[in-house]
């Protein structure tokens, strides 16, 4: 296997730059700089030289196979963060035999292949790197720390137990095996179904935390929507004008709201119009508003809005509070009156929804669980039809196990046989 190397820290001038190496020749590559290798997992300051020239002074860290991020023999060089110093060391590494520059994500790929991370943890690491808000960071850390894998291992153990019971009645019918294992299998299946359904119920909120919530600002033309967006963004994100219908397309502004990733949508003013371009903008506004996680209706005296109605979960705000009296939640994007209260109300609504977030943060996770649920529902139906359908139920159980493979890895035949032998003392 090749030994790979790459700059692990950000490119450009910095206090420290970290070079990472992984593979059988990583320690040998460090030694090529004329340094005395330190003990494993001990940082040591070493002078890196090449052709009698000092390239840099670096902290050197060595890791043994099985005790590194990738699971391979690895090394790290902590250099001064000079682009020239980094380039000089990379140039030497590129000329050493058996070494090559790493491809994108290759260190993490090796960690996956060597069992240091499961696939969900790899995805959690990617989400952690991309996290922009506190909620995203916390969620990504849970996944990276193995929350999905731990749950999946418990589900997997129950599935294997249920499969072992059914396979035993099929393959060892003449042996000392309980005649009817249906009640025990149904108990396992019912417990699993309850757990998995809870996870699916919470998955869409978890996906929203990862991808971000959308909050649409809806109202009639010239109601102050763009002015409100600018007040929320604290910059001129949208053009404002006294001319009704200025906003034709959806304008998006992404913000960190109480630790949640939120994209505010400034939509075209809703009204009946014969203007083709404006009508297209209104159609798009209605579509985006209906799909948004939360809608803020900015109302004035223009009456009902065409194409959309206020729902129970929507926020209704009286706009242009600086120009007209009123009661309830009122604001003025121009003066800032009521904006903090609106932000607090939006944050409260969205934070309330995150309480039900599960561990499944991606559509892939949810679809795998939904396939497993479908297979287990088939198992349940077959078992309730009678023992003559045990083989069909066993096949559905294997399908459920395969559906979870993307989360926990493959279930091999030996583990299934081991469970059978341990449970039913089959071995004569």
From Swiss-Prot:
Cofactor note: Binds 1 potassium ion per subunit.
Binding residues annotated for (6S)-5-formyl-5,6,7,8-tetrahydrofolate, in chain numbering: 20, 76, 116, 428
Top-rank taxon, per record: Bacteria
Protein keywords: Cytoplasm, GTP-binding, Hydrolase, Magnesium, Metal-binding, Nucleotide-binding, Potassium, tRNA processing
Family annotation (PROSITE patterns): G_TRME (PS51709)
Positions annotated to bind GTP: 222-227, 241-247, 266-269
Binding site for Mg(2+): 226, 247
Family membership: Belongs to the TRAFAC class TrmE-Era-EngA-EngB-Septin-like GTPase superfamily. TrmE GTPase family.
Taxonomy of the source species: Bacteria, Pseudomonadati, Pseudomonadota, Alphaproteobacteria, Rhodobacterales
Pfam families: MMR_HSR1, MnmE_helical, TrmE_N
Enzyme class: hydrolase
This protein's encoding gene: mnmE
Cofactor(s), by name: K(+)
Annotated TrmE-type G domain residues: 212-351
The protein's Enzyme Commission number: 3.6.-.-
Main location: cytoplasm
InterPro entries per record: G_TrmE (IPR031168), GTP-bd (IPR006073), GTP-bd_TrmE_N (IPR018948), GTPase_MnmE (IPR004520), MnmE_dom2 (IPR027368), MnmE_helical (IPR025867), P-loop_NTPase (IPR027417), Small_GTP-bd (IPR005225)
Subcellular location(s) of the protein: Cytoplasm
Function statement: Exhibits a very high intrinsic GTPase hydrolysis rate. Involved in the addition of a carboxymethylaminomethyl (cmnm) group at the wobble position (U34) of certain tRNAs, forming tRNA-cmnm(5)s(2)U34.
One GO term of the biological process aspect: tRNA methylation
GO molecular function, one term: GTPase activity
Self-association state and partner proteins as the record states: Homodimer. Heterotetramer of two MnmE and two MnmG subunits.
Name the record gives this protein: tRNA modification GTPase MnmE
Disulfide bridges in this chain: none
Binding positions for K(+) per the UniProt entry: 222, 241, 243, 246
């Amino acid at each position: 296997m090749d030994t790979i190397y790459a700059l692990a820290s950000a490119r450009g001038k910095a206090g420290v730059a970290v070079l990472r190496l992984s593979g059988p020749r990583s320690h040998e590559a460090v030694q090529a700089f004329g340094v005395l290798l330190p003990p494993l997992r001990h940082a040591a300051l070493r002078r890196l030289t090449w052709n009698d020239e000092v390239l840099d002074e670096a902290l050197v860290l060595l890791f043994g196979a099985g005790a590194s991020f990738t699971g391979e023999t690895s090394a790290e060089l902590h250099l001064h963060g000079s682009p020239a110093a980094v380039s000089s060391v990379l140039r030497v590494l590129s000329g050493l035999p058996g070494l090559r520059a790493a491809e994108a994500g290759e260190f993490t790929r090796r960690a996956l292949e060597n069992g240091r991370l499961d696939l969900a943890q790899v995805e959690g690491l990617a989400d952690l790197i991309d996290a922009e808000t506190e909620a995203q960071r916390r969620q990504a850390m849970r996944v990276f720390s193995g929350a999905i894998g731990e749950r999946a291992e418990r589900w997997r153990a129950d599935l294997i137990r249920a499969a072992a019971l059914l396979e035993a009645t099929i393959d060892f019918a003449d042996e000392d095996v309980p005649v009817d294992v249906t009640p025990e299998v149904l108990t396992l299946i019912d417990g699993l179904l309850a757990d998995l359904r809870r996870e699916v119920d919470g998955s869409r909120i978890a996906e929203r935390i990862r991808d971000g919530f959308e909050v649409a600002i809806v109202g009639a033309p010239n109601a102050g929507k763009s002015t409100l967006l600018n007040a929320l963004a604290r910059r001129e994100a949208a053009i404002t004008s006294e001319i009704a219908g200025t906003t034709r397309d959806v304008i998006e502004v992404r913000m960190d709201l109480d630790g949640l990733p939120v994209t505010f949508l400034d939509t075209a003013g809703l009204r009946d119009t014969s203007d083709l371009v404006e009508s297209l903008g209104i159609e798009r506004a209605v579509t985006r508003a209906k799909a948004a996680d939360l809608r803020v209706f900015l109302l004035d005296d223009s009456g009902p809005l065409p194409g959309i109605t206020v729902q129970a979960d929507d926020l209704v705000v009286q706009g242009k509070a600086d120009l007209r009296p009123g009661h309830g939640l009122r604001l003025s994007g121009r003066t800032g009156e009521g904006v903090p209260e609106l932000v607090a109300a939006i944050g409260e609504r969205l934070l309330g929804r995150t309480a039900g977030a599960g561990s499944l943060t991606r559509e892939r996770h949810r679809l795998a669980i939904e396939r497993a649920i479908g297979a287990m529902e088939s198992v349940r139906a077959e078992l309730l039809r009678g023992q003559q359908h045990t083989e069909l139920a066993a096949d559905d159980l294997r399908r459920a196990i395969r559906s979870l493979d993307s989360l926990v890895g493959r279930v091999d035949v030996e583990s299934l046989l081991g469970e059978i032998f341990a449970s039913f003392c089959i071995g004569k």
